[in-house]
């Protein structure tokens, strides 16, 4: 896999659990999808969720937001059990927001219209809604494309709009499902920096990001979790993972390094 250059110098010190999965298992049509999945994402942390395509990363996200109910196990937010809390309540009452792998944009709506559509759902006060949308357009450097339909935006622009949409509700837990997929190197580096900046600005938010490739994700992660064969095979800081022989043999390969 080669050498990865660190983007984020970790100053993360907190040990406050924000969202936890405890012994989650799931099967579908008698086929085991996930088995005994347990991990915690802490306040202020960027945590990576790594694993090959089809291993269940998106399924874990769907369980976390309440779209899928596990066969066994529980989900906790701020150490409160939310396993039976419906999806809309997890979003509005517990501050869970997701940037889906597909982006979640309405292709025939402009950047501004996409933001407004979500803003009208999550921000009731009109003046506050207008202010937040304008702030997101500025923060994500979308002014030049705000009136362009989403289907005409570049991959990097679409990702920035999708993240801006997810942040309108001021989430305490931000999930990003493969945000670097389909981006060129420059767009990936820009998005990495954007994510790091967001966490630096708000150290109370927990951020969980999935990817199948370690290179881009470990560069910004404080910790990471590796999935393989339905289970977690390792979790820890990037340095700890690279010292784990099981993680190296199953996932990284012997030549992978963090610079």
What does each model-found stretch correspond to?
Residues 19-21, 34:
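Conserved structural motif at the start of ABC-family nucleotide-binding domains
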Residues 50-52:
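The feature captures the beta-strand-to-loop junction immediately N-terminal to the Walker
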Residues 65:
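Helix-to-loop junction immediately C-terminal to a conserved catalytic motif
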Residues 127-145, 193-196:
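Conserved ABC ATPase "signature" region
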Residues 174-178:
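Catalytic Walker B motif of ABC-type/P-loop ATPase nucleotide-binding domains
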């Amino acid at each position: 896999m080669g050498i990865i250059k660190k983007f984020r110098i970790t100053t993360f010190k907190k040990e406050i659990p924000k969202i936890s999965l405890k012994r989650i298992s799931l099967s579908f049509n008698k086929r085991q999808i996930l088995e005994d999945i347990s991990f915690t994402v802490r306040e202020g942390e960027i945590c990576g969720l790594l694993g090959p395509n089809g291993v269940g990363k998106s399924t874990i996200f769907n369980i976390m937001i309440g779209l899928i109910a596990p066969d066994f196990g529980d989900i906790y937010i701020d150490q409160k059990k939310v396993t039976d809390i419906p999806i809309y309540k997890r979003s509005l009452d517990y501050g869970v927001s997701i940037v889906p792998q597909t982006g979640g944009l309405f292709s025939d709506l402009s950047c501004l219209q996409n933001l407004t559509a979500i803003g009208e759902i999550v921000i009731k006060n009109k003046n506050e809604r207008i202010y937040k949308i304008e702030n997101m357009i500025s923060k994500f450097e979308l002014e030049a494309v705000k009136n362009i339909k989403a289907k005409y935006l570049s991959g990097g622009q679409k990702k920035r709009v999708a993240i801006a949409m997810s942040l309108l509700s001021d989430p305490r837990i931000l999930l990003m499902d493969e945000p670097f997929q389909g981006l060129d190197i420059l767009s990936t580096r820009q998005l990495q920096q954007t994510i790091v900046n967001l966490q630096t600005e708000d150290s109370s938010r927990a951020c969980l990001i999935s990817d199948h490739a370690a290179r881009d994700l470990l560069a910004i992660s404080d910790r990471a979790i590796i999935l393989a064969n339905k289970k977690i095979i390792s979790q820890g800081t990037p340095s700890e993972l690279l010292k784990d022989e099981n993680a190296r043999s199953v996932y990284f390969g012997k030549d992978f390094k963090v610079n």
